[in-house]
C-alpha cells in the first residue's frame, strides 16, 4: 500500500537594527559602508515529503520557501521578494537488481540579500544507475550523469541603487559524468535499529540526517 511521510515547519524571523550595507556615490565613485539600520521580516516554511506509491518506487521532496522583506528606514529603501530552494528525487528499483535515481535541485524566485539586490533562479538535474554484486551486495557499480544535456547552468545577481542597476552574470560548469566502484567490508547486522529522520536545512539543499 502507498506510504506517505509529510513534515512542515513554519517559521518567522525578524530583527531591527541589523548590520546592513549603505551604498552611495561621490565624485563618480561608488562607496559602500555599513550601519546598524537594517530591518528584516521573514516568513518561512521547511518541507519534507517522502512518498512510496509502489513497492519499488520512492519519491522524495525537500524544500525551503520564504518571503523576505529588507528595509532601511533612513534611506527609505525596501526589497521584498520570495524565494525557494528545493531537492526532488525519484528512485525506481528495476529488474536485475538495478536501481535508477533521477533528481533535481535548485532555486526558484529571487533570493534577497539586502535592500539593494537579489539573485535569480537556477536549477540542476542528475541521473544515477547502480547495481550491486557478490554475496550480501558487497560490490556496487554506479554510473552518474549531472546535467548531461546542458554544459552550464546560469545565475544572475541584480543590484538596484537609484538610477544605477548592476547585473552580474555567472556561468557554472554543470555537465559531469562519473563511474564509481565501491566495496563494503564487514557484515550486515541482522537486526535493524529504529532511526529518527529529521530535516536539516543548511546551505546544502536536500539535507536529510538519520541518527540512532
Regions found by a protein language model. Give the residues of each.
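Detector for outer-membrane/organellar transmembrane beta-barrel domains
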Residues: 2, 6-7, 52-60, 66, ...
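Gram-negative outer-membrane beta-barrel proteins
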Residues: 2-4, 14-20, 55, 67-73, ...
Amino acid at each position: 500500500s502507498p506510504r506517505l511521510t509529510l513534515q512542515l515547519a513554519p517559521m518567522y524571523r525578524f530583527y531591527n537594527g541589523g548590520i546592513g550595507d549603505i551604498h552611495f556615490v561621490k565624485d563618480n565613485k561608488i562607496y559602500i559602508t555599513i550601519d546598524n539600520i537594517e530591518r528584516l521580516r521573514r516568513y518561512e516554511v521547511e518541507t519534507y515529503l517522502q512518498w512510496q506509491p509502489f513497492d519499488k518506487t520512492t519519491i522524495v521532496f525537500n524544500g525551503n520557501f520564504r518571503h523576505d522583506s529588507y528595509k532601511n528606514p533612513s534611506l527609505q529603501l525596501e526589497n521584498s521578494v520570495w524565494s525557494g530552494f528545493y531537492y526532488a528525487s525519484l528512485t525506481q528499483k528495476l529488474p536485475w537488481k538495478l536501481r535508477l535515481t533521477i533528481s533535481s535541485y535548485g532555486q526558484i524566485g529571487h533570493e534577497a540579500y539586502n535592500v539593494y539586490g537579489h539573485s535569480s533562479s537556477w536549477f540542476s538535474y542528475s541521473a544515477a544507475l547502480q547495481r550491486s554484486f557478490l554475496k550480501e551486495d558487497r560490490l556496487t557499480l554506479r554510473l552518474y550523469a549531472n546535467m548531461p544535456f546542458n554544459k552550464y547552468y546560469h545565475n544572475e545577481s541584480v543590484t538596484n541603487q537609484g538610477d544605477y542597476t548592476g547585473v552580474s552574470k555567472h556561468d557554472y560548469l554543470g555537465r559531469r559524468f562519473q563511474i564509481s566502484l565501491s566495496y563494503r567490508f564487514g557484515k550486515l547486522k541482522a537486526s535493524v535499529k529504529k532511526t529518527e529522520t529529521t530535516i536539516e536545512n543548511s546551505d546544502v539543499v536536500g539535507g536529510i540526517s538519520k541518527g540512532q
